[in-house]
């Protein structure tokens, strides 16, 4: 009997391409849930390249409803699948950050959630898939079906970027490596910390993402042309059929992006004038790199630690009296229009905190700090590569490193910091982890592949476009 594979097709189309290749070498029945917008949907309705047994369009299942949500159903669903539903929806970026387009009521959120739950549950009960292929979830509905599959014994394979560039990981979970049995006994290359850092720099993921995943149409003239085409010629039903587009009238979109453009320029001016671009490092310090907002890492990966300013305050309260906390803005935050000036001011007003410019070299901070603190990102791994202990707030795949410590209670942070000040990081442990990590990843350059897809299909001025099978 053939295996049944359910694919979640997101807007980057990687998994559609994966399904196309897989059907040539593996005897299986394939099904798909597609998230595409209205215009690319036409292609998926008629395509013959992939022999899907059935394709469901996610947004066709979610309707505007004025009735009360069925809380009895949601309560039973939550217990059946062991999923904290409020945690999912209250950290959904569409509900949190875009209220200037549309402010969802509590009942609207729950009605959307109920329809998602019923839709996913029916698919899983009807086809009973053996495998679920997806990318690492970044939106609540993606995380919902991901958890449903994991909690019902469906083998779940999620594609994700890795700690190193030009590589890709397909794994069942997010907090540990699928293959981690040989950490203490694995053969490894015995490199010094300097050699490890050179290796790390050759696979700089942040640098690669900045270079390859910048959307086309980035010049001022091209952005103006895109806006002109959108306002004059673009017509879409997404505002009625996709709750992620609710309220996005042309007028609102125009003024939102005009306002965003102006705010970004003013915020960058504030950053250039007020955030530090140099330091003598006269004081010992703990280093905390800010996470990007909006980002999966915090919204889904660490949902109870979204408020980074409160975390900064808690770290600052826990430092030894002679220490400072050095904060660095994430260079990728420019893609979110930077942060409000009030947030930067609030951080800089904390007595023992210094806020650094996004252009300040992160390697300099790693080399000179005593400890690295990270909510859930790669900084704790990079800290180990620089011979520095690290503190995280959740378990991560590199928490297997002896120098990476997960904080369970902020009341313990002061003592943990003092403990780590005398801890030495062993380069052998870092080399062991890198050897083990290599066994869990492939050399598929996902960001490069995504860039090629974008250039081929979405190089025009509008992203919601029709695509053809001929391409």
How would you name each of these model-derived features?
Residues 2-12, 34-36, 105, 133, ...:
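Nucleotide-activated donor-dependent transferases that construct or modify glycoconjugates
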Residues 9-26, 304-319:
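Histidine-anchored nucleotide/phosphate-binding helix
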Residues 21-120, 164-265:
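Conserved N-terminal ligand/cofactor-binding loop architecture of enzyme catalytic domains
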Residues 118-182:
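Conserved nucleotide-sugar donor-interacting segment of glycosyltransferase catalytic cores
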Residues 134-135, 160, 358-405:
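A donor-sugar binding/catalytic signature common to diverse glycosyltransferases
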Residues 181-232, 403-471:
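Leloir-type glycosyltransferase catalytic cores
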Residues 280-309, 314-316, 329-333, 438, ...:
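Active-site donor-nucleotide binding/catalytic segment of nucleotide-sugar enzymes
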Residues 313-357:
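Catalytic donor nucleotide-activated moiety binding site of glycosyltransferases and closely related
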């Amino acid at each position: 009997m053939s295996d049944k594979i359910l694919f979640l097709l997101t807007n980057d189309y990687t998994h559609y391409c994966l399904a196309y290749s897989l059907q040539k070498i593996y005897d299986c029945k394939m099904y798909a849930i597609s998230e595409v917008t209205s215009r690319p949907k036409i292609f998926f309705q008629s395509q013959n390249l992939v022999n899907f047994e059935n394709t469901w369009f996610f947004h066709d299942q979610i309707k505007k409803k004025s009735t009360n949500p069925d809380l009895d159903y949601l309560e039973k669903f939550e217990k059946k699948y062991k999923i904290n539903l409020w945690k999912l929806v209250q950290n959904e970026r569409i509900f949190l950050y875009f209220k200037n387009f549309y402010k969802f009521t509590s009942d609207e959120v729950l009605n959307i959630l109920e329809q998602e739950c019923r839709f996913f549950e029916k698919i899983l009960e009807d086809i009973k898939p053996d495998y679920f292929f997806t990318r690492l979830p970044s939106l609540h509905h993606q995380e919902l079906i991901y958890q449903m599959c994991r909690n019902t014994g469906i083998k779940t394979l999620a594609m994700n970027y890795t700690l190193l560039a030009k590589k890709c990981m397909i794994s069942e979970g997010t907090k540990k490596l699928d293959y981690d049995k040989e950490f203490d006994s694995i053969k490894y290359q015995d490199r010094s910390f300097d050699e490890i850092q050179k290796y790390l720099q050759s696979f700089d993921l942040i640098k690669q993402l900045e270079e390859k995943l910048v959307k086309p149409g980035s010049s001022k003239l091209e952005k103006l042309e895109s806006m002109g085409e959108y306002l004059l010629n673009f017509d879409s039903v997404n505002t009625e059929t996709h709750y992620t587009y609710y309220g996005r009238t042309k007028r609102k979109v125009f003024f939102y992006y005009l306002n965003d453009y102006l705010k970004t320029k003013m915020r960058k001016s504030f950053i250039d004038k007020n955030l530090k671009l140099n330091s003598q490092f006269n004081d010992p310090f703990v280093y905390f790199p800010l996470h990007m907002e909006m980002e999966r890492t915090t919204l889904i990966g660490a949902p109870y630690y979204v408020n980074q300013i409160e975390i900064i305050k808690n770290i600052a309260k826990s430092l030894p009296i002679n220490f400072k906390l050095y904060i660095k803005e994430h260079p990728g935050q420019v893609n979110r229009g930077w942060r409000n000036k009030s947030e930067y001011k609030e951080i800089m007003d904390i007595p023992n905190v210094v806020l650094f410019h996004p252009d300040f070299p992160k390697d300099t901070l790693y080399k000179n700090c005593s400890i690295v603190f990270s909510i859930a990102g790669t900084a704790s791994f990079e800290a180990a590569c620089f011979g520095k202990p690290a503190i995280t707030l959740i378990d991560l795949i590199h928490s297997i490193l002896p120098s990476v410590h997960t904080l369970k209670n902020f009341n313990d942070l002061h003592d943990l910091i003092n403990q780590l000040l005398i801890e030495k990081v062993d380069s052998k442990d870092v080399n062991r982890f890198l050897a083990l990590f290599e066994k869990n990843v492939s050399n598929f350059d996902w960001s490069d592949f995504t860039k090629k897809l974008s250039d081929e299909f979405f190089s025009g001025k509008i992203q919601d476009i029709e695509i053809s099978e001929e391409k």
